[in-house]
Amino acid sequence: MSRPSTPLLDKAPTPDRLRALPEQDLPQLAEELRTELIDAVSTTGGHLGAGLGVVELTVALHHVFNTPYDRIIWDVGHQAYPHKILTGRRDRIRTLRQAGGLSGFTKRAESEYDPFGAAHSSTSISAGLGMAVASELSGEKRNVIAVIGDGSMSAGMAYEAMNNAGALDARLIVILNDNDMSIAPPTGAMSAYLARLVSGRTYRSVREAAKQVAQKLPKFLQDKARKSEEYARAFFTGGTLFEELGFYYVGPIDGHNLDHLLPVLKNVRDTQKGPVLIHVVTQKGKGYAPAEAAADKYHGVNKFDVITGKQAKPPANAPSYTKIFGTSLIEEARHDDKIVAVTAAMPTGTGLDLFGEAFPKRVFDVGIAEQHAVTFAAGLASEGYKPFCAIYSTFLQRGYDQVVHDVSIQNLPVRFPIDRAGLVGADGPTHAGSFDTGFLAALPGFVVMAASDEAELRHMVRTAAEYDEGPISFRYPRGDGVGVDLPERGSVLEIGKGRIVREGTKVALLSFGTRLQECLAAAEELGAAGLSTTVADARFAKPLDHDLIRRLVREHEVLVMVEEGAVGGFSSHVLQFLATDGLLDRGLKVRALMLPDIYQDHGKPDAMYAEAGLDRTGIVRTVFAALHRDELGHEALPTPFRA
């Protein structure tokens, strides 16, 4: 299928060329950019809806501002695909989220037009404020623009940054991309006129002059004059909250109308003094009918047919871990009316949408607010409820102080289902679930589990529901299960007890998590090479199964720990126990396999695990090396001494 014709876009591969185009050509350029975006994402998959919603805004920003000298920071980065196309990366846009290709988010190492990396929400205003202050300290006059969605404004960090920006009176532009119309809709021509008026040099100059006059009046009259101006402007334009935080508010304006966007951006660029917030209203999926009709389904997409909008979906061999968690929690909630669920703006991603359908009054979506989610769950637990606070591994990092201070120190029985544990593939290092085992197992009294398959996950949901002695977590990966038989309801596991899955005599593989299947495959290969191999499923990183570990040490020559986490996790706890228990004093050969001490770039999960040595081949190679055998399993001959 041939690619769409884009004559204007072909002339503007970089922002300097874009700025050379006359303004009357920009609407056509925007349409060509939208067409190119749809065509590209149809072949790669990725985040579509958000990018379609900011096409005109992206064109306007790069036309008005002198990028890359002026800084544009895209919050989260889902909406940055049009930005990538316009900033010299169009020739690689069809490598999005593929190994060796473009990142799905902004990335400093990728382009000078990406001044700050993103993927987690609500960081843009803080980063932008730092850049704005650095610019002032350096005597620069650059503009710094942070583009943040209304969803990201539910996180406290955004308001912390705005409060600080207002106090510093910094030269910072924040563009609020309101694509859910959750704050206020634009009201047509009058709204556009007012936005252009209040953002302009004349209005703001008169306003400043009036302030100077007011300073000569008694203080109570100064206050009345200031409040009168603010109230009058707020009445017509909204934005009182942002004014109270110290921002000059402009909007709301139609984010798809370049005739409205361009003059406002120019006014703010030319007259900016102190922080300014421009409220832009957009539509997710704008310009592509299937995405406009179902914005939630086109936020993140698989490859799809451009004509029909139908997404390609590979057949599943088993239910996903996320679905198993959701259905298992529903089953437990039927037996226990104290079970409730908490999510931080990810009900579908965590499987709690299913729970919400079954128990709508027992699920709580708190928005993008992981810190609040954790402490909210702690409050529920303190009153005798059984909260399951379901958060992706990478996002739980955002609420770690609350996990420590509000949950762990008080020993409150909050349950933490940790989705997206391990490598997540196309979303790369910003979304990898690498660190949760290490940072949770470091906490006294915290029970830390990992499911090796979907049946084990069902058992762990039941175990967590029954456990009231303190906080407990269980981790599981993205994607489909391995296809094991599922019990109708999980069983309660004995805390701190693992299991032997395969018996052997010479080599022991101790797995924590879903690398168990690779361990079993490696055991087959090792057995064929004459190395009888035991495979154990640890189940718990804390408390460790000391009896199981002692048995593996006593009965085997080699012990290999295998996990889908970073340095400092399960293997570190096992090694510490081996050392303190004197189990390393007997000539045991011990090896630890975990994620490498780097941030792995995006790619396909299987290839990434192979790169990390966490597949069958890597495990076998590690055992052979420990026993000084070559790749065929033969004992390596000693190197002859040469004088």
Swiss-Prot record:
- Give residues annotated as binding thiamine diphosphate: H78, A119, H120, S121, G151, S152, N179, Y288, E370
SUPFAM superfamilies the UniProt entry points to? Thiamin diphosphate-binding fold (THDP-binding), TK C-terminal domain-like
- Top-level division of the source organism's lineage: Bacteria
Q: Which reaction does it catalyse?
A: D-glyceraldehyde 3-phosphate + pyruvate + H(+) = 1-deoxy-D-xylulose 5-phosphate + CO2
According to the record, cofactor stoichiometry and binding are noted as: Binds 1 Mg(2+) ion per subunit. Binds 1 thiamine pyrophosphate per subunit.
Q: Which GO terms describe its molecular function?
A: 1-deoxy-D-xylulose-5-phosphate synthase activity; magnesium ion binding; thiamine pyrophosphate binding
Question: Which pathway is it part of?
Answer: Metabolic intermediate biosynthesis; 1-deoxy-D-xylulose 5-phosphate biosynthesis; 1-deoxy-D-xylulose 5-phosphate from D-glyceraldehyde 3-phosphate and pyruvate: step 1/1
Record family assignment: Belongs to the transketolase family. DXPS subfamily.
Name of this chain's protein: 1-deoxy-D-xylulose-5-phosphate synthase
Q: Which gene encodes it?
A: dxs
